[in-house]
Amino acid sequence: CKVGIIPHLRDLPHILRDFPNSKVINLGKKIEEVIDEINSCEYILSTSLHGIIVAHAYGIPALWIKRGYIFTDGLKFNDYFASVEIPLYDGSKYNLEDIVCKSFHELSSEIRSLMLPHKSVIELQRDLLRVAPFEVKQSILDKVQ
């Protein structure tokens, strides 16, 4: 299947053990490798907020899955989701084992609606650059116009 799993660093050994036949993406590798691996996936399941953000930066759908190895109240996930207008949800509601080998179109419409920003990331970048408290190079501004 073309589903990538991006675990939080603490989850990595557990995910490698529990999903030996899955594409597990280690965010600790060289960034170019990570980006290539993410871009080769139909979608991402992630226990890491960074995994979700990087996937979204490249237009790859991603779903937060909360597993028992990481303590979080979900606040940082909800903060990010609110910033890109993804409806807030509890990552513990979804089971990695039940989703990992489904194609994107086999997922419920509810799940699919949670997997990509509803607000343009480029628009957010523009807004941030517009109010930056420092000079931004024109070449950077040109990339988000």
Where are these regions (language model features)?
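Active-site anion-handling motifs in enzyme catalytic cores
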Residues: C1-Q145
